[in-house]
């Protein structure tokens, strides 16, 4: 195998931003943030949803609008989305 062409495969902490859950796994993700976890320093990758917060795994329905998607939709399709018929 050629040297220097493969990504750095290392332990990374992923943090679920919706509930704060953290877990360690191995990944090639590139990130500048680090975190102290279980006595060691790891690269930190922030994610919006994980198995700890996704409704399929938790059995609970939860509405998340972290990116303002509802407001963006209402601004774009305001009259049509509110049920008013355009004539």
From Swiss-Prot:
Cysteines joined through disulfide linkages: none
Gene3D superfamilies: Ribosomal protein L31 (4.10.830.30)
Superkingdom, natural source: Bacteria
Keyword Ribonucleoprotein in record: yes
GO CC list: ribonucleoprotein complex; ribosome
A GO MF label: structural constituent of ribosome
UniProt GO BP: translation
Keywords of this entry: Ribonucleoprotein, Ribosomal protein
Pfam families reported in the protein's UniProt record: Ribosomal_L31
Membership in a protein family: Belongs to the bacterial ribosomal protein bL31 family. Type B subfamily.
HAMAP family: Ribosomal_bL31_2 (MF_00502)
PANTHER family xref list: 50S RIBOSOMAL PROTEIN L31, CHLOROPLASTIC, LARGE RIBOSOMAL SUBUNIT PROTEIN BL31C
Binding partners and assembly: Part of the 50S ribosomal subunit.
Protein name according to UniProt: Large ribosomal subunit protein bL31B
Originating organism: Burkholderia mallei (strain ATCC 23344)
């Amino acid at each position: 195998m050629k040297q220097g062409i493969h990504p750095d495969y290392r332990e990374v902490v992923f943090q679920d931003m919706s509930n704060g859950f953290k877990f360690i796994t191995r990944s090639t993700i590139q990130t500048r943030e680090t975190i102290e976890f279980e006595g060691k320093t790891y690269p930190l990758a922030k994610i919006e949803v994980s198995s700890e917060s996704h409704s399929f795994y938790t059995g609970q329905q939860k509405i998340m609008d972290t990116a303002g998607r509802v407001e963006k939709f209402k601004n774009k399709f305001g009259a049509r989305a509110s049920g008013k018929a355009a004539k």
